[in-house]
Amino acid sequence: MNKRNDDRILRQISRRRPRRQSSLAPIWVLLGIVAVFLAALLIILLPRGSGNSNISDGTSYVTTDSEGNTAPPDSGGPGEKYPGYKAISLSRDEVHRGDLILVNSDYEYVFPEDADIVGISENKTSDYKVAYDNLRLDARILGIFNDMLAEFSSVMNRRDVIVNSGYRDYKEQQDIYQSRKELYGEAYADAYVQDPGYSEHHTGYALDMSVYTDDGVSMTFDKDPDFTWFYHASHTYGFIRRYADHKEDITGIPNEEWHFRYVGKPHAYYMYSNDLCLEEYIALLRSYPFDGEHLEFRDDSEQLWEMYFIPASDSGATEVYIPTEGEYTLSGNNVDGFIVAAEKKAQ
């Protein structure tokens, strides 16, 4: 090949158009960017679990609002049906749990597997005494009780309250019933001791207390005016005097000066202010369904409350509506439904 031919070939090569790059390359780059964006968006939007799937104990079945506190699983966005409320799903078993459960001769207590029961002696303050070292109570309720006794001892300058009974398991209640029956007869045992499984003491929310002075004098609260403080102030801590003489035909229990039960502050206030026993209050709340008029009132701190009832489904889960904002409590009634108590802003 001579030089002329070489020059000609070189000129032809230099005139050739460069190979066109594939038109698919920019598309693949664009698709890659879109995929990365969608993956990041999916991570952001995926719901994160709260660690609690129901109204189980630990917060006394108190669930709070959107400020980071625990709430049961959401089964519907806020405002889908009722503006200002959102739906959660509760199982039928949840009816048997909460501060307002009614336990009496008609409604048996369902023992939970995760009850937080603690010894009173190991967790009490110096403001009161205990009759026996093995007495127990629900841990959360004991903390509230300690606060109440601290105020009482500060106001009255008395430390003569003695706790005589607290939480009882099934066997303990069985033993007490049998003991009272042998000592005082079956009629007495039937009147003052509930059958095993039907006692409020199973809840860990109830306790019996009286007066026991340093001089060894024992008496009930009604015998000393100082101790009637509990009749008129315990509701500010969420406790009620459970069995009053004039309610015996409803509760089925004769007057008990010593028996107090925790139900929660707003409920205790309303029951105290309107002279209602727990049976009456549970019945009253059924007349305030969620989709109807709600019960509204102000407590002694001028906080406005709304209460409403949602019947439990006979089968499967129940859709319960709770406020999307503000604090609220949620409880089963151990009978047929759920009760919501919500703090409400004044209009």
Feature-to-residue mapping (PLM):
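Extracytoplasmic cell-surface/polysaccharide-interacting catalytic and binding patches
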Residues: N2-G166, Y170-Q347
